[in-house]
Amino acid sequence: MESYDVIANQPVVIDNGSGVIKAGFAGDQIPKYCFPNYVGRPKHVRVMAGALEGDIFIGPKAEEHRGLLSIRYPMEHGIVKDWNDMERIWQYVYSKDQLQTFSEEHPVLLTEAPLNPRKNRERAAEVFFETFNVPALFISMQAVLSLYATGRTTGVVLDSGDGVTHAVPIYEGFAMPHSIMRIDIAGRDVSRFLRLYLRKEGYDFHSSSEFEIVKAIKERACYLSINPQKDETLETEKAQYYLPDGSTIEIGPSRFRAPELLFRPDLIGEESEGIHEVLVFAIQKSDMDLRRTLFSNIVLSGGSTLFKGFGDRLLSEVKKLAPKDVKIRISAPQERLYSTWIGGSILASLDTFKKMWVSKKEYEEDGARSIHRKTF
C-alpha cells in the first residue's frame, strides 16, 4: 500500500536545460528554482581556517563565488557528457537548499531535447530509478510541453535554448516524429562567438567564470538586426556594459554580429541549417494538408528567442521561404523562458499523467527498455 501513497504525491518537474535547470512541483505557476546547470570547483589553494567549505559548488553558491571556481557544464548540446556532475546537480535539486524533499517520495517529469541518443535517456532513467529511487518517471520532449503551456494542441514549436535548437510540428496533440528538425547551434554558441568578437576588440575573457560574464553581456546588449548588411555600413551606436569590477566596455557591431550566428551557422564554419530553415523545413516535412495551419501557429520557446528583434527577423526570413499566399503568425509568449517547465507542470498535474509514466515496478521488470515504450 505504501508505494501507492507515494505515487499519489505531487510530481516533481525538472526541465533539464543545457544552460539552466528549472525545477519545482507540478501544479505551480512557475518553477520554484532556476539556476545555471554547472558545477564549480575551487581552483586555488585554501590557506586559512574558516575558508569556504566544500569542494563542489552548485546553484546560487556557485554563482556567488564564481571568480574562485573553475566552472563546468555537464551538458553540451542537450546531451549529458559528465554523468557524475549531472547526478550531483540533480541531488542538489532535492536538497535542503532547493525542493527540500526526498526523491523517493515523488514521481518525476524530466524534459529532454528531441532526437537525443537513446543511451542518454536510458542512463537518466537508471540514475533516477536506481540512485534516487523515484516511484515513477516520465521523460518528455521539451517542445511538446511548450505547446501545452500556451493552451494549444496544434502548432509548430521553435525552441532554442542554450544547447539545442529544434522545431516540432504538432497537430491536434500528435507530434510528427518524421518532421522534427534539430540543429546543435544555440545560445552557448552565440556566447562563444561573442567572446571571439570581444577578444578582437581587445577585451579578453578567458576563464570559465569570465565566460559567464560574456553570457550576461550577450543577454543584456545583443540584438538581431533585420538587415545585417545595412547595419554593417551604418555606424552602430555603441552600448556600454558595466563589468563586475566597476570598469566599462563598449560594444559595437558585435552586438548584432554574434546572434547572427543563429540564422547563419556558416559564420563559424558549420554546415547546418539556420534557425529559420529549421522551422520552415519542419513544416515542409509535414503533411501537405497541415502546412497552412502550422504556418499560422508558430510558437517560440526558449531563452535564445528572447533577443531583441528576433521575432521580426524570423518573420522576414520565413516569408522568403514560405509559399506566397500563406498567412504566417508567430506567437512569442512572455514566459517563454519557462514555457517548457510550465507545460510540464500542467501535464504532470493532469489525471491522465499516471497512464503515461513508467513506474519503478515496470522499470524493475523490463529495465531501460520500458522508458522508450512510453516516450517516442
UniProtKB/Swiss-Prot annotation:
GO terms for cellular component: cell cortex; centrosome; cytoplasm; cytosol; dynactin complex; extracellular exosome; microtubule associated complex. GO terms for molecular function: ATP binding. Its main location: cytoplasm. One of its GO terms (biological process) is vesicle-mediated transport. InterPro entries: Actin, Actin/actin-like_CS, Actin_CS, ATPase_NBD. The modification N-acetylmethionine is found at M1. Keywords: Acetylation, ATP-binding, Cytoplasm, Cytoskeleton, Nucleotide-binding. Part of the ACTR1A/ACTB filament around which the dynactin complex is built. The filament contains 8 copies of ACTR1A and 1 ACTB. Interacts with dynein and adapters such as BICD2. Interacts with BCCIP (isoform 2/alpha). Part of the ACTR1A/ACTB filament around which the dynactin complex is built. The dynactin multiprotein complex activates the molecular motor dynein for ultra-processive transport along microtubules. This is Alpha-centractin. The gene is ACTR1A.
